[in-house]
Regions:
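Alpha-helical structural context detector biased toward long hydrophobic helices
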Residues: 2-286
Length: 286
C-alpha cells in the first residue's frame, strides 16, 4: 500500500570526501577490530577513486591545446562516464549482493536453513551481510542517519574539526555502508530462527524490509542497546537473526502473534507496505 510514494533521484550517488570527512570516518570506527580497520582503509581507497580520477582528468584538460577538438570530445566522454559511474557503482554493488539471495530465499521458504549452518563457501557470512544491507540501505535509515550526522555537523566542532569541514550529505552513504559491514561482522555468529506462520494472517513486508525488533520506531532518537533483526521472506515464512531465546524454528499459531510483527514492520516503514491480502492492507490505512 503506497504511503506518499516518491522517487528519490541519485539515492546512491557517491559524493567527494574531503580530508576532514575521511578523518571523521576513521575516528568513528577507531574502536573496531584490526580486520575491520583494514576493510575500512580498503573501502576509503575505493570510495575516493573517483576523486583521484577526476583530479587527473582536470590536469589532462589543463595541458591540452585549446583547439584540440577531438581530445576535448574524448574528455567530455570520460567526464560523462565518471558521472554515470558515481551514480551507479554502489547500487550495482548492492544488486550483486541481492543476486546471491536467489538461492537463499527459496531455501528459507522451504524451511531449509542448512546453507546457514552447514553451508560451504562462507554462505553464512554472505547471508548475514545481505540481511544487514537490506536493513541499512533504505530511505528511512538514511533519514535517521542524516539526522544524526546533521547534529554532528552542527555540534561536533573543535580545533580538529572546524565548523563546516564535515557535511552530512557527503558522509551518510559511506557511513551506512561501513556501519552495515561492521554490523555484519558482529552478527557473524548470531543464531538464525525460522518463523513459520500457521495463523490466518499473512506476514506483510515494506520499504523497510528488515527491522530491529528492539528499536522504538515511534522515537528513533532513543538509544538502542539490543539488536534482533526480523525479516519476512514470504506471507508464511520470516526469520529472526540474533534472537538467543528462540530456537531454530518457531511456529506462530495465533493471529495476534503475526499481527504483532506486522505492526512493528508497519511502524518502521516509510512510504509503502505490501501484502498478498488486500484486507490486511486496509487495516493499516491512515
Amino acid at each position: 500500500m503506497p504511503r506518499n510514494i516518491a522517487f528519490e533521484k541519485d539515492f546512491y550517488r557517491i559524493s567527494s570526501l574531503n580530508d576532514k570527512e575521511i578523518e571523521f570516518i576513521r575516528l568513528f570506527f577507531r574502536k573496531t577490530s584490526d580486520s575491520f580497520k583494514k576493510e575500512l582503509e580498503n573501502f576509503i581507497k575505493l570510495y575516493t577513486t573517483f576523486d583521484r580520477d577526476e583530479n587527473l582528468f582536470k590536469v589532462l584538460r589543463g595541458i591540452l591545446p585549446i583547439d584540440c577538438s577531438e581530445a576535448d570530445e574524448a574528455m567530455e566522454e570520460i567526464d560523462s562516464m565518471l558521472d554515470i559511474a558515481r551514480n551507479n557503482i554502489l547500487e550495482d554493488t548492492y544488486c550483486l549482493f541481492e543476486g546471491e539471495s536467489i538461492s537463499w530465499l527459496p531455501s528459507l521458504c522451504n524451511q531449509d536453513t542448512s546453507f546457514f549452518y552447514n553451508g560451504k563457501d562462507d554462505q553464512r557470512e554472505r547471508f548475514v551481510n545481505f540481511v544487514c544491507m537490506q536493513y541499512y540501505r533504505t530511505a528511512g535509515i538514511k533519514e535517521n542517519t542524516m539526522r544524526v550526522l546533521k547534529e554532528a555537523e552542527e555540534y561536533f566542532v573543535n580545533p580538529q574539526f572546524p565548523k563546516g569541514c564535515i557535511k552530512a550529505d557527503n558522509l551518510y552513504l559511506p557511513m551506512l555502508w561501513l556501519i552495515s559491514a561492521q554490523c555484519s561482522d558482529v552478527l557473524l555468529k548470531a543464531p538464525l530462527t525460522l518463523l513459520i506462520n500457521k495463523s490466518n494472517v499473512p506476514f506483510i513486508t515494506s520499504d523497510q524490509p528488515v527491522i530491529n525488533t528492539k528499536a522504538d520506531y515511534s522515537d528513533l532518537s532513543k538509544e538502542i542497546t539490543e539488536l534482533v533483526f526480523y525479516y519476512p521472506i514470504s506471507p508464511q515464512i520470516a526469520i529472526l537473526l540474533n534472537d538467543s531465546v528462540c530456537g531454530d524454528k518457531v511456529e506462530l499459531t495465533t493471529d495476534d502473534e503475526v499481527t504483532a510483527y506486522n505492526d512493528l514492520l508497519f511502524k518502521a516503514s516509510k512510504k509503502m507496505i505490501f501484502s498478498n491480502v488486500p484486507d490486511i492492507l486496509e487495516q493499516y490505512k491512515k
